[in-house]
A protein has these predicted regions:
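Conserved acetyl-CoA-binding loop-helix of GNAT-fold acetyltransferases
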Residues: 84-100, 232-236, 241-258, 263, ...
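Hydrophobic beta-strand residues of extracellular immunoglobulin-like
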Residues: 48-51, 203-206, 250
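Acyl-donor-binding surface of acyltransferase catalytic domains
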Residues: 65-152, 292-296
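Short amphipathic alpha-helix that is part of the acyltransferase structural core
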Residues: 1-37, 149-183
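N-terminal charged segments
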Residues: 6-55, 60-63, 69-72, 93-96
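A conserved beta-strand-loop-helix scaffold within acyl/acetyltransferase catalytic domains
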Residues: 25-45, 62-70, 178-234
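A conserved beta-turn-beta hairpin within the catalytic core of GNAT-like acetyltransferases
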Residues: 66-76, 83, 106-107, 201, ...
Length: 303
């Protein structure tokens, strides 16, 4: 097995690997070159990313991000045709070694995310990891344009050009208590949202109450091939419980339908305290697949 750091020339083969893993584990391939290029822009390739080769083939991918409080987030992928060759074990070994090296004191924690399968669950448990959070990919097949019921006292409109900083602030407040949320400055946030070439403010609804921004949804047209994508739905705490989240999602369904989308998907924290997953189920969305985040407490310094 050969383990090395990637170069920009590895982008396309890395995406091919990630898509093969997604297709095998979830039935849906979502990664594309734009997404991985954006992800790599937040990492240092020579320190945070590994490629694993077996018999000259790209067999595995892993990356790692250190967050405040001694938390280390890592993602790992093994090509479905090359599983059982020790790649997954090597990914975990390197991730743990690097996490210990980068967290100075005992009590650091390493988090890994993987699609939920009996094999993956057994693999992580056998190496001292425990599941701490579950996330779902949910979708709906739209047969007709949904009706949108706007709650009393609420105004729904689309984002106005130039108010993106205010929308960013709203969504940061809405997700401030979300599990493992990391507050990002506007420039970093906009790089993955408002500055994208396919960002369309006329596809993104905003809710106002008495002229105050109360909630918003960032949506993307054909972001996943023939799927519409609801990227972020947030309602600030002071305005929750008034049906605003449901109105934003219904509006998003309706506008995507008018633009020709018949399938719409989103990702959600299955344990979100606001009950978002239950809301989406009530609106007719079904779970396509579920992924677990696994945690291991790191004790002792790296050797």
């Amino acid at each position: 097995m050969n383990v090395r750091r990637p170069t920009p020339d590895d982008l396309a083969p890395a995406v091919e690997l990630l898509r093969a893993v997604e297709e095998a584990d979830t039935g849906e391939a979502e990664w594309d070159e734009r997404q991985l290029r954006e992800h790599w822009s937040t990492l240092e390739l020579e320190h945070d990313v590994w490629l694993f080769e077996v018999d000259g083939r790209l067999a595995g991918y892993a990356d790692l991000e250190v967050r405040p409080g001694g938390r280390v987030m890592s993602d790992g992928y093994v090509h479905p045709e090359l599983r059982g060759r020790g790649v997954g074990s090597e990914i975990l070994r390197l991730a743990e070694e690097e996490a210990r090296r980068r967290t100075d004191a005992d009590g650091g924690r390493l988090y890994l995310q993987n699609a939920t399968t009996s094999h993956a669950d057994g693999f992580y448990r056998s190496r001292g990891f425990s599941p701490v959070r579950r996330f779902r990919r949910m979708a709906i097949e739209l047969e007709r344009e949904p009706e949108v019921d706007v709650p009393p006292g609420v105004v729904l409109r689309t984002i106005h050009r130039g108010e993106e900083p205010a929308i960013h602030a709203l969504l940061e407040d809405a997700f401030a208590e979300h599990w493992e949320h990391r507050r990002r400055g506007y420039e970093e946030y906009a790089e993955r949202t408002f500055d994208r070439g396919d960002y369309d403010p006329t596809l993104c609804p905003v809710a106002e109450v008495d002229g105050v921004l109360a909630g918003a949804s960032l949506n993307w047209w054909k972001d996943m091939g023939d799927w519409g994508w609801i990227g972020t739905v947030g309602v600030v705490p002071a305005f929750r419980g008034r049906g605003i989240g449901e109105a934003l999602v219904r509006w998003s369904f309706a506008e995507l339908f008018r633009r020709g989308e018949r399938r719409v998907a989103l990702g959600v924290d299955a344990q979100n305290e606001t009950g978002a997953a239950r809301l989406y189920e009530r609106l007719g969305m079904r779970t396509l697949w579920e992924a677990a985040v696994w945690e291991k407490e790191l004790r002792g310094a790296a050797s």
